[in-house]
Each structure stands twice: as C-alpha cells, then as structure tokens.
Amino acid sequence: MKPIRLTILGILTPLLLGCSSSAGSYPLDLPAEDYITTLEINDIENFTICVFNDLHISVLTNLTDEIAYYEKCLISNGGELPSLIVLNGDSFMGAAKSQVERFFDWIDSKGVPFAYTYGNHDLQGTYSNMLIDQVIKSCEHAVLLNPINDNVFGDSNYVLNIEEIGTPNTLKWQLYFYDSNTYYGVDYDVIHEDQIAWYEKQQQALEDLGTPNIPSLTFMHIPTEEFEEAYKTIGHNVTSGHDTADTESLWYMGESISWGYKETEFYETMQEYKNNKAIIVGHDHVNLTDWHYDKDEGSADNMIHLIYGLKTGRGIYHDTRIMGASFYTLKDSNEFDIKWMNVPYEEDPFEITSGYLIGLGEGAIA
C-alpha cells in the first residue's frame, strides 16, 4: 500500500455538544469545507477501496470468529490491505457497547483510513445514539465527519478528497458519504432535500475553486428508486444477466429492491452536475448489481453506475454464493474498476465473474 497522509479540515469548536448559545443559532449553515477530509497520496493509480456491507454485528455474534473473517475479506484482493475501508451501513444491529468498541479497536489497528455510513439498523443497540459517532471519532484512522447541530439531516454526510501529492497537490477524486436515514413510518426513509442541497453546495464550492470537473463516487446504505427503474428497463425483471448488447450492465437479483418511501431528485441532481460516477449501496443482502443507468438518456458519459455491493459475513440472512467484500480501484482517467470477491469462511476467496453471476439465476440473459 502506498503511503497515505490524512488531513482533517474545518471541525469547529462551536460544533461540540454543550456549546453555549452565544456560538449562534441552530441549525448551523456551515461552509462546504467543514465537511471535507483529505487523503494525500503519492499516486492515484491503484488507489483501492474495500467496502463492507451489512455486517449486522449483534449480541449473538461471536466477534472473535467474525473478525477473523473480516481480516480474510480485507486481504482477499491479492493479499494486500486496501488504501481505504468503507463500512457502508448496518455494521450493527442489536449489538452491545463493548462489541462496538472492540470492532472499532480492531479496524483502527489495521492502520488503514476508514469511512463509515449509517444504515437503518446501526442505532438499534444497547448504547446511546451518540456512541458510534464518539467511538469512531476517537480512532486515529477514521475519516468520518459529523458536525453537530448543522442543517443537514442525518449523521454521516461528508466528503473525502483524494489528493495526489505535488506542488501544489492535485485533487483527483471525491468520495461522498450519506446517511440514507432509517424509517418513515413503516417504510424506509430517503435522502432528504437538505442533503441534496448540501451536495449542490459541495459542487458549487468546486466551481468556486476553479475545479468543477472532479469525478466522484457516492456511498450510502439504502438504494434509490433508480435501482428499481434500472432493473425494469435494463434487466427486464430477469433474475440475473449481463447486458453485453447495450449497457454492459451486470446483475444478480436475489430479492426485491427496498428503496425509500418516495421518489426524490437526488439522482437527477447528480446527473445534472455530471461528476458522480456511481451510487454504491448495501441494504438488500442478496442483490449484486452494476447497472449502467442513464436516466435522462443523454450522452454516454452521463451514465451513473448503480451498484449493490456484496454483503459481508453471515449476520442475519445471506447467500454464501455472493458474500464477501467489494473492491473499487480508482483511475486517473476518471474511471474505476470493480472487483467482487466471494469470501467463504472455510475455503479460499475467489473473484465473482460475469459468467458465475449469470449462472446463479434462472432464466438469465447473457
């Protein structure tokens, strides 16, 4: 792994809990840079992100066994640690405080920067709603930013800038992390309008700096309605397939798509700015997709990948045929590579190929 230097920008003293009212009225309308962490690297080529989805650590989990499995997942892509680890929601469900602390002690001990997004189950444990945030912020290698009392809904809305070291540094990629929230009545919640406005504010900040065309990936837990649209229009509701004739989309759908309670303008806003290359989610444990979806049917370079990543581990329901870790390797060409590694508990990891994925579904199309 190439040397990485971590810089955290703009956490202000008035954001701490318990600050006096003289700091200003709430909610706080903070500048874009207060949500940005920067990783400085020597070379963008081969910067690899390992994503864990839906660990579902609970009081029933044997954390010793599961940590051994997570270790196996981390090095499943060629035997080396990744450049960044992303925990993309539902790491916990019904866990104890001691398990949360032990898990983050372990992941911080790897010496790899790690990002965290909240899923709909993470706060369902025998601990306060602030515990996960507090434990993560105490970790040396965490990149989570969560300003308190701001005007952006949720607890994990922030940006990771990937900069190549030079004179001056060059911003190569941005990684966006969103709290896709929990529930709206009996349904799942959505990305709120103020979160969409926050994204627009971040994009405007890039324009103000004279760097408007920075590629990005988006990580969040709950999918948007576009995942279902892509399944219908590209996949024709067939369980698995590889659309080699047109979009190059690849998918296996083991369950229905559990998106939020209403449609939003989140995807459309991203497509308008033309910088975001993918929305990467978890949530539905036995779906694995790379939809190449262009909702406005414009130019090919305005397509957004809609990616269900692999579920990690055997916490609650799972399919051992598609379980392990997802790896995304950034390129200097504004593109990225995807590698899905199936990681059995007792056998050697192997890469999930298009042929393997197609073969999992009945009536698959190639």
Q: Which residues are covered by each model-predicted region?
A:
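Extended active-site neighborhood of metal-dependent phosphoesterases/phosphodiesterases
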Residues: 30-32, 99-211, 306, 326-331
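N-terminal active-site segment of His-dependent metallophosphoesterases
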Residues: 22-102
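Binuclear metal-dependent phosphoesterase catalytic core
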Residues: 26-30, 36-37, 159-163, 266-268, ...
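Acidic/histidine-rich helix-loop elements
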Residues: 50-68, 92-98, 125, 130, ...
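C-terminal motif of bacterial Sec signal peptides marking the signal peptidase cleavage site
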Residues: 15-18
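Active-site environment of divalent metal-dependent phosphoester hydrolases
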Residues: 58-60, 92-96, 116-127, 183-186, ...
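His/acidic metal-ligating clusters that form di-metal
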Residues: 78-83, 174, 188-288
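Beta-strand-turn-beta hairpins that frame and shape the catalytic cleft
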Residues: 37-50, 155-177, 214, 292-306
